Each structure stands twice: as C-alpha cells, then as structure tokens.
Amino acid sequence: MTSPGAPTEPHCGVCGAACPPPFRAPAPEIAPDLDLRPGEPTRSTLPDWIATCRRCGAAAPDLTVLPPEALAVVEADAYRALSGAHPEFALPFLRWAMILRGTGDRAGAAEAMLQAAWSADDAADSINAARWRAEAAFLWGEPADVETALRRIDVLRRAGEFDAATAAADRLAGRALDQTSASVLAFQRARIATRDIGRHLISSAVPPPAHRPHVAARQRDRRDVLGRLFRNPRRE
C-alpha cells in the first residue's frame, strides 16, 4: 500500500501501464550543431530521449502526459506497421512523430523526425538520415521564427536538397537578422554553394567573443537568436 505523501508510480497515458519516468539528459558542454543537436555529453544520450510503453507501444519523452488523441494513433495499422518498415534504432522517434502528427502538432513532429535523422547519423545510415531530414523540413513548412528557419536551411542542406536550401536562404536573407543569425546564414550559403552535406558546429559559423562583452552588449545578446548558445558550451 502506498503511504501518504509517497511519490506515485508513473503510468502510460494511453493504456495505464507502469512506465519509466522521463529521461533527464546531462547539460551539454560542447557547442551544438547548426541544426541545434546538442553537444556532448547530451549528444550521446539520444537513444534515451524517447520512452516506449511495453504494453501498448506508445512512444513519447513523457508517456504520462500523452493526450487522449494518442490512443487512436497507437491503435492504427499505420502505427503498428512502423516496426517492420524501419530500423529499430529510429522506431521511438518515428512513433513519436506519428503521434504528434495525429494530434496536429506539425512542429513537434518535425523535431521528432529530425531526431530520427540524428539516430540515422549515428548508425551511419545516410539514406534514411537524408529522407527523415527532408520530412522534417516539410513538416516545418515556412517557419515564422528565425531560429527555426536557420535550422530548416541546415536540414535541407544536409539532406542534399540544395535548391530548396538556396531558396530558403534567399527568403531569410530578406528579413531583419541579428548579427549572429546573419553570420550563420552566410556560413550556410557558403556550404550550400560547395554542395556540402556535412555536419558543422554553430561555433564554426560564429566564433564566440574573445573577451567578456560590455553589459550593454550582453543585454543585446539576450535578444540574439543564437548568440545565447555560446554562454555555456565550450568549443570542440
């Protein structure tokens, strides 16, 4: 019998089975990639980011908060068919992406598909990595915010979709960008021009400042889309 005040065991929001608590990754110590995949030690914990219910097969970072709409997705034939159609290492992310699409969260589904692409990177599966990046870019559509627009350009470039990446970069160049975002965009355009599909760190596009900025500069940096990423991670 559970004593009063004792923590309750987490349960799957779809079927009610006991499930593990959400994974808590360590803070990154290395700069992120241009698509914002975090650096180490967070990077290597990717396989732990999504939990899968042993009873019903639902997948999510936190199984306890799955919405009611997830039940219909998890019980659908298309969801069950994922197991035989895709490599095991990517299934948690693909399942989570399908649940998010089924509940109308396209932006969340794009993130899940990008994570599937990261898992393919780690498995040296370049075909699926490109395929799932292209799907992430499609799900994002035309992002309203600059950060996602920059990430989408990187995703398209790494998928080998150079024409689409060029068009997206041209559109973003017409918007008002802070200094860091403009530097990242220029770096991306140079990589696209050379048909580079490789991984690059943000620190390669925008080296961190060599000295501690004046307080006014630090205040401006709070509004800087990507500059905040250099406060903690050290360069690789």
Task: Cite the ranges covered by each PLM segment.
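Boundary/linker segments of alpha-helical solenoid repeat arrays
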Residues: 140-149, 174-189, 213-220
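Extended interfacial segments that mediate partner engagement and assembly in macromolecular machines
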Residues: 63-143
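Alpha-helical linker/edge segments of TPR/alpha-solenoid repeat scaffolds
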Residues: 123-125, 156-167, 187-226, 232-236
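N-terminal cysteine/histidine-rich coordination modules
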Residues: 1-75
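Short, intrinsically disordered terminal segments enriched in charged and Pro/Gly residues
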Residues: 77-96, 179-182, 211-227, 236
